[in-house]
Design a protein with these regions (language model features):
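PLP-dependent amino-acid enzyme catalytic core
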Residues: 1-165
């Protein structure tokens, strides 16, 4: 049976965001306040970091800074790296993630499952060492550092989407 081309099927990118809001039912003390929480774990890569990862890559694409096939580089300790690995895989980018060796094996497995190349620095070097290596790789022409810690497109993912939701 042929697939109906007129039906639009959602992509992974379409599934980032629009996470449910839930009312927190048990608040300390006697209050009539209503507190809501966003279930960001419902994003495809499972965290609040899916939005900024998609934003950082999509905004760089829209500026023409990157095109599919390019190599992206990022220092990470976990969830941002997982989200970037997912987005890079979907959009056709190679991704090098640099992280301290003492991060969880589960996170490393997920990043690799999405196709990211992992480069570990010593635990002593930590995130500073990971960032420095990322910048060194970029200087050698090995790819573009997304630089989540100072990239204005990182919080834009929440400002433009999470907030209005």
């Amino acid at each position: 049976m042929a697939m109906n081309e007129s039906i639009r099927y959602p992509t992974i990118e379409d599934m980032v965001g629009d996470t449910p809001l839930v009312r927190l039912q048990r608040l300390p003390g006697d209050t009539s306040n209503v507190i809501l929480g966003k279930l960001e774990g419902n994003n495809p890569a499972g965290s609040v970091k899916d939005r900024p990862a998609l934003s950082v890559i999509s905004e760089a694409e829209s500026r023409g800074t990157i095109v599919p096939g390019d190599t992206l580089i990022e220092a990470t300790s976990g969830n941002t790296g997982i989200a970037l690995a997912m987005v890079a895989a979907v959009k056709g980018y190679r991704l090098k993630l640099i992280m301290p060796a003492n991060q969880s094996e589960e996170r490393k497995l997920v990043m690799r499952a999405y196709g990211a190349e992992l480069i570990e620095v010593s635990s002593e070097q930590g995130m500073e060492g990971a960032r420095d290596l990322a910048l060194d790789l970029q200087a050698k022409g090995d790819g573009l550092v997304l630089n989540q810690f100072v990239n204005p497109d990182n919080p834009l993912g929440h400002f433009s989407a999470t907030g209005p939701e």
